[in-house]
């Protein structure tokens, strides 16, 4: 699996997923079940900087309500925040 250091734009992905999960009052186990991944794998995404495969990214982004552009087009997000 790729790590954050290898994937520009994904520096905050794990933290974003974790914060969104908590904001939606979802237990890690519940989110992992919705995405059909192991709870430990989700913990690695949230805490260890593991970048999952694209289908998992898409599901996490949809369920958590995260903006896809933040990860795949980070320059646009930076320009909008300035």
Q: Where on the chain are the PLM-derived regions?
A:
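A short, Lys/Arg-rich alpha-helix, primarily the initiator
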Residues: 1-23
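Recognition helix of helix-turn-helix/homeodomain-like DNA-binding domains
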Residues: 36-51
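Short, basic-rich loop-to-helix N-cap that marks the start of a DNA-contacting helix
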Residues: 49-62, 78
């Amino acid at each position: 699996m790729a790590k954050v250091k290898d994937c520009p734009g994904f520096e905050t992905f794990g933290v974003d997923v974790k914060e969104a999960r908590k904001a939606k009052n979802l237990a890690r186990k519940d989110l992992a079940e919705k995405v059909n991944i192991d709870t430990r794998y989700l913990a690695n995404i949230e805490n260890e900087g593991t970048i999952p495969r694209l289908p998992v990214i898409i599901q996490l982004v949809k369920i958590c309500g995260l903006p896809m552009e933040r990860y795949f087009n980070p320059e646009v997000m930076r320009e909008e925040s300035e």
